Amino acid sequence: MQNWDTATNNNSNNNKSPALTMQQTAANSNNFLEHNTWYNQMFAANIKQEPGTINPHHQHPQQHSSMMASQPQHSPLTHSANHLENYLKQHAHNGGGAHHLQFSDNSGAMTPSPNTNVGGQDFGFESNTSSALNPSLQQHQLYQQHFQQAQQAAAQNQVSSHLPLGFNPLTPPGLPNAVLPAMNHYYSQQQQQQQQRQLQQTPSPSACLSDAHEKSSALTPRHTPPMDITPPKSPKTTVQAMDHQQHPEDQDLISNSSEDLKYIAESEDDESIRMPIYNSHGKMKNHKCKSCGMVAITKMAFWEHARTHMKPEKILQCPKCPFVTELKHHLEYHIRKHKNLKPFQCDKCSYSCVNKSMLNSHRKSHSSVYQYRCADCDYATKYCHSFKLHLRKYEHKPGMVLDEEGIPNPSVVIDVYGTRRGPKNKSAANAALKKACSDLKIPPTSQLSAALQGFPLQQQQQPQQPASPAKSSSSVASELPALTLNMSLQQNLAQQQQQQQQSPGAQSHSSQQQINNLLPPLASLLQQNRNMAFFPYWNLNLQMLAAQQQAAVLAQLSPRMREQLQQQQQNKQANENGEEDEEDNDEVDEDEEEFDGKSVDSAMDLSQGTPTKEEQQTPELAMNLKLSEEHGETPLFSSSAAARRKGRVLKLDQEKTAGHLQIASAPTSPQHHLHHNNEMPPTTSSPIHPSQVNGVAAGAADHSSADESMETGHHHHHHNPTTANTSASSTASSSGNSSNSSSTSTSSNSNSSSAGNSPNTTMYECKYCDIFFKDAVLYTIHMGYHSCDDVFKCNMCGEKCDGPVGLFVHMARNAHS
């Protein structure tokens, strides 16, 4: 507009006089003020004023307000057209025809007004302005409405394309402290803001900024939880949140535990099975195939790959999603997740799950006991899977496993490289042996049961079922009183009859036997047969229990009984020294003296440890063999230690070996009667039932003719030089940290006449462990544990063992598949 005024003034000054120039200048100044008033009215809020211009609002505020009140509002085009028409009219009256021609030439380049007749001579500006006032006002209002609608649409597109989350990403909706405003409140505020913007005449760009700020502030949670709260791994989507609002009864069934969010009901359209899953630490969850090791990042890819390892006829597929499995209970657990059924509820919190194993794992979170500890470092954990991962990663060894109450449980074995979940029990290692041993024939009476009862059994009594050596010490001890009470009357009657028939020399031994009967049966059994081998890890508990029982009984004995015991030992020692004409009798008497000294003077001294090789080679238990006139048999055992036969399959009498071996390290033998010459009177002995442990006769055999049997039992050893030498099974006893094998091997000369009376049986001997087996299955199972390169290395798992005892302990404690 200033350029137009300048051009007009230059043209007028060239053709007019000074008087006309002054009038024109005054008119231009009035027009300039009017133009600035209109210009500021239209664009004062949006366009910055130039430094040289004068704002009419500051110079004439009252005049401007009165003028705005009196005059109606016009559109920008109408105001500009009226202003130019008035300006040209003034120049037409003052300038004449020449000036009009020049103005027409200059105005040809300008934009004509729609109400101006450029080619005509008559300019009716006032009439045209008054007639076009109402249409121009309507056009201005219509333009303003269209402009506001377009601006609102742009603001909505901007907000929808950059919609804020509405919650803190670390504390998404669903947490108890997150409070979001209601959606209806948000929409009501938005409608009020739109109505207020419609009342504004001129739109402003600041309205969009304030609108976006108000929307973002309305969606921000008012009470944000603290940042130290661990967020869930997968927040709920908006659609799921709306579904939970519509069905509050279904929402109550869902547990608020973060672990349950992994099992949100999946469907074919759920993105959780097609997209990778990230945990709270930002780490992506991988799905590893147990068959080939393939790693998938989505459930969909993992299930597709799992199909390749399954047989088509065994595939079980979920009807709601692509989940596949071969196990029926896995499909059942998966369907429970779809139905949101969690029948297993924790009794200490609100946690619920779909199966029992998940509940057991959760219950450990409430316990303060760390069951699994590493033996090589300070690592401790509550979960077996984490413990196995630690052992595999650092190649460490597991320590003692605790039970749920924090008590050490040595029967639990950690299979580090196994695929089976959870720990294993040691009893599983002996399942094959127990099954094979169940097929063996059990003798009519058991040596172990007879010894545990603490009194001799007559042939007329009912056969007793053998006590299993795999029982614990507490269960065996609980059976002892019942066995003793049931047969106490028969024992007393048998002792009275025997005392009437006994010789004066045998009555002294009867008193010794009565003293031994005072001891607990288990203590008496282990005291008289120290090398009797139960299972290696079970024998120590029995010895400790027997020592406690024996100490308690000896503490209650009177001084007279103790003196009687010492006197009997001295008498035996004198008799043994007087009988040096035979070497075999000397060895038996020396062994008896050594054994009685240990058993009487010390209450089951466990500090002596495992017997040495010299002690193992001596026939400690040959003193307990009994003689009988009714059976013409030779003893199975003798004192010769050089008659061992390793690696040979021996043929022995079935009667002599029946019940002699039960399991690999638990030898028991039937009663082997010796047929002696007529040197022994037939009236000094009574029939004896063949049920005695190898060498256990002091507490479980007949009291008659015991001393005479010792003196005359070996006179016939050399009368048959053509008999075959046989070897018996060795016995092994281990305690705690002992790794040396305790084995004895004895041989005897069998009578040819008695060997032909009964069928022969085959004996299998392990030359590495000095153990005999009657059954080929047991022998095969046992030899399968010996490795070819190293006989004491386990052939199943490759673990190196220290001797035969270490190998037996390893076989008993570790489960082998």
From Swiss-Prot:
Q: Which Pfam families match?
A: zf-C2H2
Question: What keywords are annotated for this sequence in UniProt?
Answer: Developmental protein, DNA-binding, Gap protein, Metal-binding, Nucleus, Repeat, Zinc, Zinc-finger
The segments labelled Disordered in the record are 51-77, 93-132, 187-252, 456-477, 491-513, 564-619, 666-758
Q: What species is this protein from?
A: Musca domestica (House fly)
What function is annotated for this protein?
Answer: Gap class segmentation protein that controls development of head structures.
Its chief place of residence is nucleus
PROSITE patterns in the record: ZINC_FINGER_C2H2_1, ZINC_FINGER_C2H2_2
Q: Does the keyword Chaperone apply?
A: no
ZnF C2H2-type residues are 287-309, 316-338, 344-366, 372-396, 764-786, 792-816
Underlying gene:
hb
Write out the similarity annotation: Belongs to the hunchback C2H2-type zinc-finger protein family.
Name of protein: Protein hunchback
State the Gene Ontology terms under molecular function.
DNA binding; zinc ion binding
Q: Where is the composition biased (Polar residues)?
A: 103-119, 680-694
Tell me the InterPro entries matching this sequence.
Mediator/Homeobox_domain, Znf_C2H2_sf, Znf_C2H2_type
Q: Where in the cell is it found?
A: Nucleus
